[in-house]
Design a protein with these regions (language model features):
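N-terminal cap/lid segment of alpha/beta-hydrolase-fold proteins
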Residues: 36-76
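C-terminal catalytic histidine-bearing segment of alpha/beta-hydrolase fold enzymes
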Residues: 239-293
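N-terminal Sec-pathway targeting helices
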Residues: 3-21
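Primarily recognizes the serine-hydrolase "nucleophile elbow" in alpha/beta-hydrolase
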Residues: 136-198
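Conserved alpha/beta-hydrolase "acid-adjacent" motif
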Residues: 221-227
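Short beta-strand element of the alpha/beta-hydrolase
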Residues: 78-89
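Catalytic nucleophile-loop/oxyanion-hole region of alpha/beta-hydrolase
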Residues: 94-95, 101-102, 114-152, 275
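Short beta-strand/loop motif that positions the catalytic acidic residue
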Residues: 208, 214-216
Length: 293
């Protein structure tokens, strides 16, 4: 037995060293990734001077004001308003990353665009808090429609990934409050508990929910998950449309803009993905014009 123990000692020691090296490597990787994430989050934010849009805060009684950016194309007539919601897995992202894109689609679609810099789900902030910020922002612009030359009957909510969830959740909450949303666009959106929330609503409210366009990325479980919501909407008589972009990656629409050039996290940014992104924007714009006419 003594000889056996001696033979095992070097093996155990080697295994211990391997585990120690792996543990150190893991810690270093986590620290590096955490540093990069923090650097990316800071790099997403623009100064008011750098912004193309107009930055201001939407006031709320008894609650923190909501941080928004506004994009208004030249128009003598009242126009639809699009609430454009960034992604980031609920814990990252910033409305400023949509700055170039929001300015572009405002001009190309002939619609006002509002990006909502909802609070991220960390440091005690819940995902529902962010949904409430979106809802309150919609209500503010609806109440001040004349001031911004927008049509309060042509409200659109558009979101990507986590912003796609906020789109679905805010649209349902507004319907519960008797506020009509004209259209919702869900781009590879997180589904979470949306189907359960929808099914719990009275039948009349379920049938009155806004028409929905689902933009799907390729080979993306998050995109595919959102189809569960599309199915129940369709079953309740809500107009839906699904557009899948073959070869596209999760995040391809918003990430293919200049704001992502300086970030470490830009997996879906490439010339090929950018072509798909611009096509998707054209598709969304044309779909909205058909819905809003």
């Amino acid at each position: 037995m003594e000889k056996t123990k001696r033979r095992r000692h070097p093996v155990l020691k080697t295994i211990g060293i391997i585990f120690l090296v792996l543990a150190v490597a893991l810690v270093v990787t986590l620290i590096r990734n955490g540093k990069r994430s923090a650097e990316d989050q800071a790099a997403m934010v623009k100064t008011d001077e750098e912004l193309i849009g107009t930055h201001f805060y939407v006031p709320r009684d008894g609650k923190d004001d909501v941080d928004v950016n506004l994009y208004l194309p030249d128009s003598a007539e009242t126009m639809p308003v699009v609430f454009n919601l960034h992604g980031g897995a609920f814990i990252a992202g910033d409305a400023d990353t949509l700055d170039t894109q929001s300015d572009r689609i405002a001009k190309e679609w002939g619609m006002a665009v509002v990006t909502v810099n909802y609070k991220l789900a960390k440091d005690g902030i819940t995902i529902q808090y962010a949904v409430d910020e979106v809802v309150d922002t919609v209500l503010y612009f609806r109440e001040h429609a004349a001031e911004y030359n927008i049509d309060p009957n042509k409200i659109v909510i558009l979101g990507y990934s986590a912003g796609g969830y906020h789109t679905m959740a805010a649209t349902l909450e507004l319907e519960k409050q008797g506020v009509d949303v004209a259209a919702q666009v869900i781009c590879y959106g997180f589904i979470k508990e949306v189907v359960e929330t929808y099914n719990a609503m009275p039948e009349a409210q379920r049938q009155a929910v806004a028409p929905a366009l689902f933009i799907l990325a390729d080979n993306d479980p998050i995109s595919d998950g959102s189809l569960k919501y599309e199915e129940v909407l369709r079953q309740n008589g809500v107009a839906t449309e699904v557009k899948k972009y073959e070869g596209s990656m999760h995040g391809f629409i918003e990430e293919n803009n200049p704001e992502y050039e300086k970030l470490h996290s830009k997996a879906s940014k490439s010339p090929e993905q950018e072509v798909l992104a611009r096509d998707a924007e054209d598709y969304i714009g044309n779909w909205l014009k058909g819905i809003l006419k």
